[in-house]
């Protein structure tokens, strides 16, 4: 078993991604052929469930783009279901401390290394037990990325980085800026300083730093600092802004959005 996304992070090869919020396998397949290294299937803020995640994983599978799945919470039951339908790389939201990071890792591992329930005969991940020795290979193929999105999580970053099995740490600029008192303004100098310091700290610890930033200049800045998995756009935003711009060129009166947040 292989995990190409995890392998790329291990060797320090930057991965450029796109956020998927349309919760649709047709658009997921379209975007899988667009040249991004990874695609984030969002179960936290987009209207996804296990079934819609499954169909998007199936749609992306023939393409080089690697899927990353974000569950709605650090919940071992939900994580188990997502792994069984074929997710190998998970982005766990709102991890505040080392204990929560350890819980996330444990949920992705079969015993005795963790608490993942065994149901491989029913699982797409094992190709319904057609992958030889799946139960003994699966743990090593898992890639666990945890999100730090608050001042509390930032203060606990060093201990989170010490947790075995954490492959990367993703900085959530939208929630972090809100928690710092600058909601909707992730480009505030204090927020930017916190993000940049975290990227350097994560990389120095031998883990992969990640972030979502649609501002091209900032995304490139984070890559220069050592970020290894950077999402540079969101499908919903690309569709909305592209449609608005096209309509405007033909005289439509709708005012184009001036939003300047992360997305």
UniProtKB/Swiss-Prot annotation:
The record marks 70 as: Transition state stabilizer. Keywords: Aromatic hydrocarbons catabolism, Lyase, Metal-binding. Pfam families: HpcH_HpaI (PF03328). It catalyses: 4-hydroxy-2-oxoheptanedioate = succinate semialdehyde + pyruvate. Binds 1 divalent metal cation per subunit. It comes from the Bacteria. Pathway: Aromatic compound metabolism; 4-hydroxyphenylacetate degradation; pyruvate and succinate semialdehyde from 4-hydroxyphenylacetate: step 7/7. GO terms for cellular component: cytoplasm. SUPFAM superfamilies: Phosphoenolpyruvate/pyruvate domain. Its cofactor is a divalent metal cation. Its EC number is 4.1.2.52. One of its GO terms (molecular function) is metal ion binding. Disulfide bonds: none annotated. It is an enzyme of class 4 (lyase). Substrate binds at residues 147, 174-175. Transmembrane segments: none annotated. A divalent metal cation binds at residues 149, 175. The active site is at residue 45. One of its GO terms (biological process) is 4-hydroxyphenylacetate catabolic process. The record marks 84 as: Increases basicity of active site His. Catalyzes the reversible retro-aldol cleavage of 4-hydroxy-2-ketoheptane-1,7-dioate (HKHD) to pyruvate and succinic semialdehyde. Homohexamer; trimer of dimers. Belongs to the HpcH/HpaI aldolase family. This is 4-hydroxy-2-oxo-heptane-1,7-dioate aldolase.
């Amino acid at each position: 078993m292989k995990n190409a996304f995890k392998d790329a992070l291990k060797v320090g090869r930057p991965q450029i991604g796109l956020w998927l919020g349309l919760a649709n396998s047709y658009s997921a397949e379209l975007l899988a052929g667009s040249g991004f290294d990874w695609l984030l299937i969002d179960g936290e803020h987009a209207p996804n469930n296990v079934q819609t995640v499954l169909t998007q994983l199936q749609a992306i599978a023939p393409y080089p783009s690697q899927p990353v799945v974000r569950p709605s919470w650090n919940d071992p039951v939900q994580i188990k279901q997502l792994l069984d339908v074929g997710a190998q790389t998970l982005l766990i939201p709102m991890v505040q401390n080392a204990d929560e990071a350890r819980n996330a890792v444990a949920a992705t591992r079969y015993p005795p290394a963790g608490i993942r329930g065994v149901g491989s005969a029913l699982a797409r991940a094992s190709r319904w037990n057609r992958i030889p020795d799946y139960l003994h290979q699966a743990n090593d193929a898992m890639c666990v990325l945890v999100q730090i999105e608050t001042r509390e999580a930032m203060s606990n970053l060093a201990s989170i980085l010490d947790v075995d099995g954490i492959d990367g740490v993703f900085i959530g600029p939208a929630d972090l800026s809100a928690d710092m008192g600058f909601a909707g303004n992730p480009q505030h100098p204090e927020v930017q300083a916190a993000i940049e310091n975290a990227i350097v700290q994560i990389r120095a610890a031998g883990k992969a730093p990640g972030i979502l930033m649609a501002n091209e200049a900032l995304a490139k800045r984070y890559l220069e600092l050592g970020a290894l998995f950077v999402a540079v756009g969101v499908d919903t935003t690309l569709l909305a802004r592209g449609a608005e711009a096209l309509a405007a060129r033909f005289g439509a009166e709708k005012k184009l959005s001036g939003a300047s947040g992360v997305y």
